[in-house]
Design a protein with these regions (language model features):
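A Zn2+-metalloprotease active-site environment signal
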Residues: 25-240
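Helix-centric, low-specificity signal for extended rod-like, repetitive segments
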Residues: 1-2, 232
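Bacterial N-terminal signal peptides
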Residues: 13-22
Length: 240
């Protein structure tokens, strides 16, 4: 992992070199602006690297933290159903990551994927959808994981100004703590772009059509949720 101090040293060198090209009258303000922009860009890169490491290596911890936050449905029938569908999707050879999938007790029609390849499906969705529809839902959520959408969502939820403040503080441990906390709480208010949703639908369907499930389950699952919530089906997500 690249230490924050190395980033600061690198940026200070760049800002100093920039000052040689700036007229004296504008040097102070321009250097300050350049420094902020450079620190912001570098911190975004560093934060993304750390989140990628969490996404790849912290699955057990993220699973435990997420389950503690959402609760878990201890129902063998639900667990077996999810495991069976997941196994069928993985058998296509088109799923590259490992996912931990579990049911939570919420009665809302929803499911989510978060840092660590953790996927949670609400009890309400398990009760409402048949296996074809649920399989497409899991295809969709797995594609969020394959494309690392949660990483970008966490970065957006923190904001560039907060990352710059942490960077200028020079304490890498603070950034670790911040990212860990936001990653766990991210499930309460996901930042998912409409382009990411469309991508998850399209690439998810590419997986889905290579299974034995009825491809009509893709359309019927989305139609069912729309009929229940109308335009409010997006509630709980920040769409950009």
């Amino acid at each position: 992992m690249i230490e924050m101090k190395l980033w600061k040293k690198w940026l200070t060198t760049i800002v100093a070199s920039l000052s040689l090209c700036i007229a004296p009258a504008a040097m102070a303000s321009a250097a300050s602006t350049a420094q902020i922009l450079l620190y912001g860009a570098a911190t975004m890169v560093l934060a993304k690297q750390q989140l990628l490491q969490m996404d790849n290596n912290n699955q057990k911890q993220m699973l435990a933290n997420t389950q503690a936050k959402t609760g878990v449905v201890n129902n063998e029938a639900y667990s077996d159903r999810l495991e069976n569908i997941q196994r069928n999707l993985v058998a296509t050879g088109l799923i590259k990551r490992n996912y931990d999938v579990y049911a939570n007790p919420s009665t809302d029609l929803n499911a989510f994927e978060t840092i660590g390849g953790v996927i949670s499906v609400n009890k309400g969705m398990l009760d409402a959808l048949n296996d074809d529809e649920l399989a497409f839902t899991l295809c969709h959520e797995m594609q969020h994981g394959e494309k690392r959408h949660a990483i970008n969502g966490v970065l957006k939820s923190i904001g560039i100004s907060t990352l710059v403040d942490v960077s200028l503080g020079g304490n890498a441990d603070v950034l670790d703590i911040l990212l860990g906390s936001v990653a766990v709480n991210y499930i309460d208010n996901e930042f998912v772009t409409m382009d990411q949703e469309k991508q998850a639908d399209a690439t998810g369907f590419n997986v889905f059509k290579n299974t034995a499930y009825n491809v009509g389950g893709a359309a019927s699952s989305m139609q069912y949720v729309y009929e229940q919530y109308g335009e409010l089906w997006q509630e709980g997500f920040k769409r950009i």
